């Protein structure tokens, strides 16, 4: 994969003063040292703090349980992998030959780890305030699609309940493609609504995860129209 430096205008939203931090954040353990595992450790804590702070401020009446469930939904592996794809991290990862051959640049776990490592790299490059300003927009669509009191429900369930409450047709989930070896499958699914008209596509290491991602994006579309 190409390990080109992010420039202004890239989806990440930050130009690195220290490009070595970016290079390390994008280097998987399979490619040798220095790899991104220590940055991943630091980034995990920063992501949890940023998301927890955002939820605390946006949901002033939510109890601890609702906040905890919401944070878990937003920082889970699949959700972070969606962000990684949005940032085009897969094409920029440095992977060892084995991971390259097995499609590691598409794997949710590797993409999620890379997102956490990038967050840590931004923090070390420019400090917490700038890190918050860059990273929180990555979560905006997911935050908007996660109503208070329904954080324990998955996106497909929330979408179905939203449609049923309005006596509208249920969504259709269509498999667009299935690729990869048995141990590294990648599913591409579309979520299609007849009324109101909406469509979004999701990807994941299982059909269920791909459908959940697509449903999340459809919910974000519906919220933006209100």
Curated annotation (Swiss-Prot):
Chain's role: Digests double-stranded RNA. Involved in the processing of primary rRNA transcript to yield the immediate precursors to the large and small rRNAs (23S and 16S). Processes some mRNAs, and tRNAs when they are encoded in the rRNA operon. Processes pre-crRNA and tracrRNA of type II CRISPR loci if present in the organism.
Top-rank lineage group of the source organism: Bacteria
UniProt keywords, alphabetically: Cytoplasm, Endonuclease, Hydrolase, Magnesium, Metal-binding, mRNA processing, Nuclease, RNA-binding, rRNA processing, rRNA-binding, tRNA processing
GO cellular component: cytoplasm
Residues engaged in binding Mg(2+): 40, 113, 116
Essential cofactor(s): Mg(2+)
Entry's Gene Ontology BP terms: mRNA processing; regulation of gene expression; rRNA processing; tRNA processing
InterPro entries named in the record: dsRBD_dom, RNase_III, RNase_III_dom, RNase_III_sf
UniProt-listed Enzyme Commission number(s): 3.1.26.3
Description of how the protein assembles with itself and partners: Homodimer.
Domain RNase III: 5-127
Domain DRBM: 154-224
Any one GO molecular function term: ribonuclease III activity
Protein name per the record: Ribonuclease 3
Catalyzed chemical reaction(s): Endonucleolytic cleavage to 5'-phosphomonoester
Family: Belongs to the ribonuclease III family.
